[in-house]
Amino acid sequence: MTTTKRLKFENLRIQFSNAIVGNFLRLPHSIINVLESTNYAIQEFGIAVHSHNSDIPIVHLGWDGHDSGSSENVVLINPVLATVYDLNQKSPLVDLYIQRYDHTHLATEVYVTPETSDDWEIIDANAMRFQNGEILHQTRIVTPGETLICYLEGIVTKFKIDRVEPSMKSARITDGSLVVVAPKVNKTRLVKAEYGHSNKTILKNGAIQLLKKVILRSTVCKMDFPKDNLFVVYISDGAQLPSQKGYASIVKCSLRQSKKSDSDNKSVGIPSKKIGVFIKCDSQIPENHIALSSHLWDAFFTHPMNGAKIKLEFLQMNQANIISGRNATVNIKYFGKDVPTKSGDQYSKLLGGSLLTNNLILPTEQIIIEIKKGESEQQLCNLNEISNESVQWKVTQMGKEEVKDIIERHLPKHYHVKETGEVSRTSKDEDDFITVNSIKKEMVNYLTSPIIATPAIILDGKQGIGKTRLLKELINEVEKDHHIFVKYADCETLHETSNLDKTQKLIMEWCSFCYWYGPSLIVLDNVEALFGKPQANDGDPSNNGQWDNASKLLNFFINQVTKIFNKDNKRIRVLFSGKQKTQINPLLFDKHFVSETWSLRAPDKHARAKLLEYFFSKNQIMKLNRDLQFSDLSLETEGFSPLDLEIFTEKIFYDLQLERDCDNVVTRELFSKSLSAFTPSALRGVKLTKETNIKWGDIGALANAKDVLLETLEWPTKYEPIFVNCPLRLRSGILLYGYPGCGKTLLASAVAQQCGLNFISVKGPEILNKFIGASEQNIRELFERAQSVKPCILFFDEFDSIAPKRGHDSTGVTDRVVNQLLTQMDGAEGLDGVYILAATSRPDLIDSALLRPGRLDKSVICNIPTESERLDILQAIVNSKDKDTGQKKFALEKNADLKLIAEKTAGFSGADLQGLCYNAYLKSVHRWLSAADQSEVVPGNDNIEYFSINEHGRREENRLRLKTLLQQDVVHETKTSTSAASELTAVVTINDLLEACQETKPSISTSELVKLRGIYDRFQKDRNGEMPNGENSIDIGSRLSLM
């Protein structure tokens, strides 16, 4: 059955059934069999009910899919619906015409009007249930001019169908259709406002006739409005102007649930007031748009915004005699707490060139404008074409009760009255924006594209990285340059998100706003607070319920946005912002709601210089010394986020205030002092090493390895202007391999100190985890940590234990680690500022894929030192200095010949030579201690000879006192000699070194040396780079791998 053909069934009787809820029929079994044979869905059938042998339909209904259960010629209908169309069980027979309504007969929008004001109040009281689709569930076929019924909480409401979009005689609605209800208010129940809100066009002096009415979309443009004309609007330059004067009013959003109060019973959908305006044209205004002056927005009690529906009514040109301000009296009623701040002459200058409207309230000026001509009020007063002398200006102070009434009944919530009586409007934060990231342009281009795959995108980045600041910059641009309405919400500040009904109501309000004011953009900052990722609840049922609510809310949000998006691709866009993409509910991605993801990283040095200059400029007291530049400071603040830079700038300011005689000039010393005491957020909790206490000169030999490390790690940072223009990808990975104890780990530790890079050391147990996915997560977090503190060296010691060849692990853990390493080291993002340094003694055990270009680009051997290299190592050991005192750690006699020791230590590694020196040092210590034990000690002496004059019997007492004094002198002398001995240093002689050389043996045996030499030779020459074929070995004793 095609859409143009109809099935006709005659001579059917009508019966009532309360089981039918809505605008449906139930058909007899004979008709159902015919419809089921067509293989079309029951939702696609529409039924036209005709009187028998009549061509005029009574009503168009849908089929609810049930059998009437009666005789073959009976159809069932809801009794209330039957009453509407005067159908009863005693009515004559009816005929049914059944037609298929396919996708070409779908209505996107249906405009209806309640039959009575009671119906409207029922809808208003049950707006949530109505908006959640009650009418869509109870209706399938809509026809202009017919009546619908809808059950809300058991109460029946009736609607008249005004029109459908796209226009057609009869159409089918689905879950994606929008039903727009025009309010119908009982006028006798309205409380008439004393001031303003007048929609009449009939005056006592005569009638103001309207030429034309248009509804335009408001836009916030960067325009210079005339200062002498407060109430002016600009429309598109291509529009024809029937008149240069007219009324402007805002059409309230009819999709939003009205909020009634005792002081304001106005209904949504009715213009709040009409204000007389001058109408001008400008080429900056897009077609079908209108720009309003700031005073006009203020008179509407509304923030300047995009998307508001502005009703513009043009006045006839020959009405000048009616709206003339000649001989008029303008009474300015001041409702501030204090006396009026301006005189009549000042108000004359402020309002003199405008078109004034009677009883107009200007909240920020705290005045009400009243216009009279003689004894009667005048609705409009044109002061632009007459002199101020022909107008009488009066300023009066309103009483306290009148002021209180105005504030309670007329001023919206975003206006507040201060204790001084001043009325102000809470406005948006208008910061001075500074663009430091290029991804804003990419995001704006994507969001403003006419066609995109899905409506949502995600911006992620760590806390303090600048997401909210970037969002504000983006919102400012799309509002000013692209005329898009933006609804911004910080999900962390939302209350009662655990209450499903209240949050659904809030989401419905967002979507209603965006549909009405569209094209629009919903920006949800910190989205993980509202749509977080479900986590393991460990048996806690309450936690499970909370996550279940979060998923329900997200599903509800996706469905609401998708409905609008499917109707009009340009109507709505969504931008999510969160700390990590993995913390957001995966339902967003499972339903393919998000199409693109942008990640915000720490600013580079140019952006940091720009930010530092911006934060310094905000603090007008500080200034840099002449020898400092912001580009120099940016090099010292690698890894700082914008928030870190802002806090750091404040710290510099406070440190500056503690200095005396500084003239508020930031010097190099002050900056370094503040920097050393500040830790950026990216480094908090990170095991980071920047001072390894191992200097380049502490390592002997290994000249080739040192050169390669400096070329790879130091040069790109030191000579950045040269390397930044390199057309090829720079080397970022080095493998140090060689015999045990030959300085691989020592080199890695010293290179960070030499090149001034951050250093993160990684050990196998910190990464490997038996649980699937845990090891990979550790690798990802490790690289993210290194990226946040770049330039950084990521050092993997004993790399063969972390990334062995795949297919030889019984648990499969290291296989997954290798796969993740391959992705991170040579992924699409690359490693900008992160260098990989790996050390191993068995390079043959490392997976060959990691040794290819783009990963570990260069392999450097740390070989067994030759005689000259051993001499170099010995000299480095004995010449090493203490970091704190600057003195040599190793005291060697002056005439010692280290070349002799180098000749006798063939086959020794660097670690062996260091151990030999330590053994020699111990021998010198033993020799020094033996010499110290033989030091002189002053003996005691009991035979003391002395003489005394006039002792008078006190001889023995004096002898004992003298003995005590002498013993104290002996103790002091012993202590002094011991203190002097402690300052001596054990000196290592050549004999100590020779004895230690005889006692020390190489740590690498001859057989092990031969084995390793063969491995390294094959690694250097015969390595073919072949990977395992993935097949398990079938040899006896081989292990299986969990792949």
From Swiss-Prot:
Effect of residue 495 to A: Cells are able to grow on a medium with oleate as a sole carbon source
Protein name, per record: Peroxisomal ATPase PEX1
Entry similarity comment: Belongs to the AAA ATPase family.
Summary of subunit composition and partner proteins: Interacts with PEX6; forming the PEX1-PEX6 AAA ATPase complex, which is composed of a heterohexamer formed by a trimer of PEX1-PEX6 dimers. The PEX1-PEX6 heterooligomers associate with the peroxisomal importomer via interaction of PEX6 with the peroxisomal membrane anchor PEX15.
PANTHER family the UniProt entry points to: AAA-FAMILY ATPASE, PEROXISOMAL ATPASE PEX1
Cell compartment(s), UniProt: Cytoplasm, Cytosol; Peroxisome membrane
Induction profile: By oleate.
Effect of residue 488 to A: Cells are able to grow on a medium with oleate as a sole carbon source
Superkingdom per UniProt: Eukaryota
Region entry AAA-cassette D2, spans: 733-926
Phenotype upon changing residue 744 to A: In Amut mutant; abolished ATPase activity of the PEX1-PEX6 AAA ATPase complex
Effect on the protein of changing residue 467 to E: In PEX1pA1; no effect
GO biological process: protein import into peroxisome matrix; protein import into peroxisome matrix, receptor recycling; protein unfolding
GO molecular function: ATP binding; ATP hydrolysis activity; protein transporter activity
CDD domains linked: RecA-like_PEX1_r2
Annotated phenotype, changing residue 525 to Q: In PEX1pB1; no effect
